UniProtKB/Swiss-Prot annotation:
Cross-link (Tryptophyl-tyrosyl-methioninium (Trp-Tyr) (with M-251)): 97-225
This protein's name: Catalase-peroxidase 1
List of residues binding heme b: 266
Quaternary structure and interacting proteins, as annotated: Homodimer or homotetramer.
General function of this protein: Bifunctional enzyme with both catalase and broad-spectrum peroxidase activity.
UniProt keyword list: Heme, Hydrogen peroxide, Iron, Metal-binding, Oxidoreductase, Peroxidase, Signal
Entry's cofactor comment: Binds 1 heme b (iron(II)-protoporphyrin IX) group per dimer.
Family to which the UniProt record says this protein belongs: Belongs to the peroxidase family. Peroxidase/catalase subfamily.
Cross-link position per record: Tryptophyl-tyrosyl-methioninium (Tyr-Met) (with W-97): 225-251
Cofactor(s) annotated in UniProt: heme b
Class in the EC hierarchy, top level: oxidoreductase
HAMAP family: Catal_peroxid
Length: 728
C-alpha cells in the first residue's frame, strides 16, 4: 500500500490537540486535587479588551431606550417561534426566573449575576427547555446595544419589563452584572449521573428522611426548583409543599415570599405539553451543527405555538394569561381540582365544572376556550395550612399581593448582585433593604500621617502580630465573590452571629476589639472599627515584613463603615460562618470532604487564584496566625517574621513526612529521626500536588525573599479590599 494513501476513516492530519472531553488528566488520576475551579475565568477566554470595564460601559447605556425596545419586543410575534396570545411576556419571565432561580444561599453560587444560562449545563437543563428561543428573540436588542448591555442584565431586565407590560408595577431594576465567557466549574449541581433522577436513584441528593444535600436547593438534577408533577413525579401537594419550603428557604425566601413568587410567576404565561416529548431533538449542547445552538427542535411535527412541548404539562393557570391580575387565586381557591394527564403524559390538576368564561382562550384561536391547569406546586399553595393562610390574604387583598410579589421578584433577581453600592442605573429603588446587608457610609478621610500615627498606636497597644493578623483575616474572610456578601466592611465580626462563631475565637476576638475600641475613643477624628481592624492587620504585616528585612508599605484605604445589629439579618449571616479555614489551619470538625478540597472551595469563593492561595498559606503560617495558636504547619523558628521559611522547609529533602493520625503528619529529620514539625493535609498538599509544588518551589528559592513578601502583601490587600466596591 502506498504510504501516501490513508485507510478510510482515519484522519490524515497529525494533530495532538485534545479537542474532546476524553483522556482528561483527572480521568487517569481521579483522586488528584483538581485546581480547575481556581483557574476557570482566565482572561484568555475573555474576548473583551483588557481595559474594558462593563460597569463603566453600562453607565453610558440609554436604559429608557432599552426598555422601550423590550416593550415592543413583547408583542412582536415571530413566525419561527410565535408568541402565546401574541405576547412573549410569559416566556421572558420564565427565562429571567430560571436565570435567577439557581441561586442558593448556602454558598451564594448560581443566580443571575453572570449570564451563565448561555452555557452548559444550564443551557441544556430539562427545566430550561426552549429558553434558548427566548434568548434568540432578545438577540437583536443585545446586538443593538452591544457591550453596554450584558446578557446577564438583559435577561433580568427582559423579565421585569415583561411584568410591567402586563400591568404590574415593579419595584425596580439594577444593572451591573458582567458576563462570563465559558461554563462555570465551581458550582456543584449534584452528583446524579442522569437528568431528573428520582430521590432513590444512585448518587441521590437525598438521605435520611428526605434530607436534601447541602448546598443544593433544587430537588432534582436539571430542575430549577421542585418537580411540578409532584415528589419524584408522584402528585401529592402536601409532600410537594415540604420540598417547596426547603427549596425556597435555601434561596433565602420566607413563606410569604414563596407564595407570592409561585402565584406571581403563574399569574401569566402557560405550560407547554401539547405533543409527544419523544419527538423533540437533543438539547442545545447535543444538537446538530446546523441547528446553530438551538435545542429541543421538533422535526417530525409542527412543534410551535399551540403544539409546543416544554415541561409536558399543558395549559395556562389563569383566565387572562397576558394580564397581571388576581386570577390565579380566584381559580385556585374557588374551584375543586382533579388529577389529569396532559397530552404529553404529565400529571396536572384541572378544575371540576369550571365556568366557560373562566377558561383561557387558545394561544392561536381566541374562539376556542380550554381548561386552565395547576401543577402540584400550585396545589400546595392551597392545601398546605401555612401557605393557604397566605394565599387567602393575597386573594382578599390584591394590592398587597402585588406589592409583596414586586418586592420578592426584585429580591429574587438581585439577591446575588451584592450590596446596594453595586447597583447601577436609573431604576434603582431608594429604599434600603436588610437583605442587601446595608453598611453606613463614612464621612471622614485619613491623611498618610494619620494612618501612620494610628498604626503606631495599635502596635504599641500590646496586641501581638498574630492577634492583629488573625482578627483582620477573620473579619475579611467571609467575603464571597459568588454573591458579594461578607467581608471586612461593616465590621459585622463584632455583632451576632459572627462574634460568637467558633472559628473567630470569641475570647481572643473580644480582647482585640476592646483594645481597638480604646484606641478609637482616644483618636481626635472619628474612625470606624472596621477600618481599625484592617489597619491593625496592615500594621502587623508591615512589622513582620520589616523583621524579615523587606521594607514594604502595605496599602490601606480608609472608608469602611460600622453596621449595626438593626442592619443585620442575623439568620441570613449564619450561612457565612466558616466551618473550615485552611489559611488558619482549622476546621470545626471532621468532614467527608478532604480539607484540601474545602480549601479550594473557600479560595474560589474569596476570588483568589492558586498561586495567591499558596502565598497566603505560607505567610499566614510564619505569622503565627493559626487557630488557637496551633503549631501545625508553622515551619519556622522565627514566628512573626514574614519569611519564606514555610516553603524552604516544606521542599527540603532533609525531612520526610509521616502520618501521625487523622489529618496529622510529622515532619521528621532524616538524620536524627526526630520530629521537627507537625502538619496537616492543607500544609503538605503544597508539596504533594504538582501544580502547588511548582508555586512552593518559586517561593522557596534563594532569590524569593522579596518576591514572597511583595506577593503576600498584594494578596493580603486584595482580601482586605475584596468588598470595597467603592474602590473598584
Amino acid at each position: 500500500m502506498d504510504k501516501a494513501q490513508h485507510t478510510q476513516g482515519k484522519c490524515p492530519v497529525a494533530h495532538g490537540g485534545n479537542t474532546t472531553v476524553a483522556s482528561d488528566v483527572m480521568e487517569w488520576w481521579p483522586n488528584a486535587l483538581n485546581l480547575d475551579i481556581l483557574h476557570q475565568h482566565d482572561n484568555k477566554t475573555n474576548p473583551m479588551d483588557p481595559n474594558f470595564d462593563y460597569r463603566e460601559a453600562f453607565k453610558s447605556l440609554d436604559l429608557s431606550a432599552v426598555k422601550q425596545d423590550l416593550r415592543a419586543l413583547m408583542t412582536d410575534s415571530k413566525d419561527w417561534w410565535p408568541a402565546d396570545w401574541g405576547h412573549y411576556g410569559g416566556l421572558m419571565i420564565r427565562m429571567a426566573w430560571h436565570s435567577a432561580g439557581t441561586y442558593r444561599m448556602a454558598d451564594g453560587r448560581g443566580g443571575a449575576g453572570t449570564g451563565n444560562q448561555r452555557f452548559a449545563p444550564l443551557n441544556s437543563w430539562p427545566d430550561n427547555a426552549n429558553l434558548d428561543k427566548a434568548r434568540r428573540l432578545l438577540w437583536p436588542i443585545k446586538k443593538k446595544y452591544g457591550n453596554k448591555l450584558s446578557w446577564a442584565d438583559l435577561i433580568i431586565l427582559a423579565g421585569t419589563i415583561a411584568y410591567e407590560s402586563m400591568g404590574l408595577k415593579t419595584f425596580g431594576f439594577a444593572g451591573g452584572r458582567a458576563d462570563i465567557w465559558h461554563p462555570e466549574k465551581d458550582i456543584y449541581w449534584g452528583s446524579e449521573k442522569q437528568w431528573l433522577a428520582a430521590s432513590d436513584a444512585e448518587n441521590s441528593r437525598y438521605s435520611g428522611q428526605r434530607d436534601l444535600e447541602n448546598p443544593l436547593a433544587a430537588v432534582m438534577m436539571g430542575l430549577i426548583y421542585v418537580n411540578p408533577e409532584g415528589v419524584d413525579g408522584q402528585p401529592d401537594p402536601l409532600k410537594t409543599a415540604q420540598d417547596i419550603r426547603v427549596t425556597f428557604e435555601r434561596m433565602a425566601m420566607n413563606d410569604e415570599e414563596t407564595v407570592a413568587l409561585t402565584a406571581g410567576g403563574h399569574t401569566v404565561g402557560k405550560c407547554h405539553g401539547n405533543g409527544r416529548a419523544e419527538n423533540l431533538e437533543a438539547a442545545p449542547e447535543g444538537a446538530e451543527l446546523e441547528d446553530q445552538g438551538l435545542g429541543w427542535l421538533n422535526k417530525t411535527s409542527r412543534g410551535i405555538g399551540r403544539d409546543t412541548v416544554t415541561s409536558g404539562i399543558e395549559g395556562a393557570w389563569t383566565t387572562h394569561p397576558t394580564q397581571w391580575d388576581n386570577g390565579y387565586f380566584e381559580l385556585l381557591l374557588n374551584y375543586d381540582w382533579e388529577l389529569k394527564k396532559s397530552p404529553a403524559g404529565a400529571w396536572q390538576w384541572q378544575p371540576i365544572n369550571i365556568k366557560e368564561e373562566h377558561k383561557p382562550v387558545d394561544v392561536e384561536d381566541p374562539s376556542i376556550r380550554l381548561s386552565p391547569i395547576m401543577t402540584d406546586a400550585d396545589m400546595a399553595m392551597k392545601m398546605d395550612p401555612e401557605y393557604r393562610k397566605i394565599s387567602d390574604r393575597f386573594y382578599q387583598d390584591p394590592a398587597y399581593f402585588s406589592e409583596v410579589f414586586a418586592r420578592a421578584w426584585f429580591k429574587l433577581t438581585h439577591r446575588d448582585l451584592g450590596p446596594k453600592s453595586r447597583y447601577l442605573g436609573t431604576d434603582v429603588p431608594a429604599e434600603e433593604l436588610i437583605w442587601q446587608d446595608p453598611i453606613p457610609q463614612v464621612d471622614y478621610s485619613l491623611t498618610e500621617q494619620e494612618v501612620t500615627d494610628i498604626k503606631a498606636k495599635i502596635l504599641a497597644s500590646g496586641l501581638s502580630i498574630a492577634q492583629l493578623v488573625a482578627t483582620a483575616w477573620d473579619s475579611a474572610r467571609t467575603f464571597r465573590g459568588s454573591d458579594f456578601r461578607g467581608g471586612a466592611n461593616g465590621a459585622r465580626i463584632r455583632l451576632a452571629p459572627q462574634k460568637d462563631w467558633q472559628g473567630n475565637e470569641p475570647a481572643r476576638l473580644q480582647k482585640v476589639l476592646a483594645v481597638l475600641a480604646t484606641i478609637q475613643a482616644g483618636l481626635t477624628k472619628s474612625v470606624s472599627i472596621a477600618d481599625l481592624i484592617v489597619l491593625g492587620g496592615t500594621a502587623a504585616v508591615e512589622k513582620a515584613a520589616h523583621a524579615a528585612g523587606v521594607h514594604v508599605k502595605v496599602p490601606f484605604a480608609a472608608g469602611r463603615g460600622d453596621s449595626t445589629l438593626a442592619q443585620t439579618d442575623v439568620e441570613s449571616f449564619d450561612v457565612l460562618e466558616p466551618l473550615h479555614d485552611a489559611f488558619r489551619n482549622w476546621q470545626k470538625k471532621d468532614y467527608v470532604v478532604q480539607p484540601e478540597e474545602m480549601m479550594l472551595d473557600r479560595t474560589q469563593l474569596m476570588g483568589l487564584t492558586a498561586h495567591e492561595m499558596t502565598v497566603l498559606v505560607g505567610g499566614m503560617r510564619v505569622l503565627g496566625a493559626n487557630y488557637d495558636n496551633s503549631k501545625h504547619g508553622v515551619f519556622t523558628d522565627n514566628v512573626g517574621v514574614l519569611s519564606n521559611d514555610f516553603f524552604v522547609n516544606l521542599t527540603d529533602m532533609s525531612y520526610n513526612w509521616k502520618p501521625a493520625g487523622k489529618n496529622l503528619y510529622h515532619i521528621v529529620d532524616r538524620s536524627t529521626d526526630k520530629v521537627k514539625w507537625t502538619a496537616t493535609r492543607v500544609d503538605l498538599v503544597f508539596g504533594s500536588n504538582s501544580i502547588l509544588r511548582s508555586y512552593a518551589e518559586i517561593y522557596a528559592q534563594d532569590d524569593a525573599k522579596e518576591k514572597f513578601v511583595n506577593d503576600f502583601v498584594k494578596t493580603w490587600t486584595k482580601v482586605m479590599n475584596a468588598d470595597r466596591f467603592d474602590l473598584m
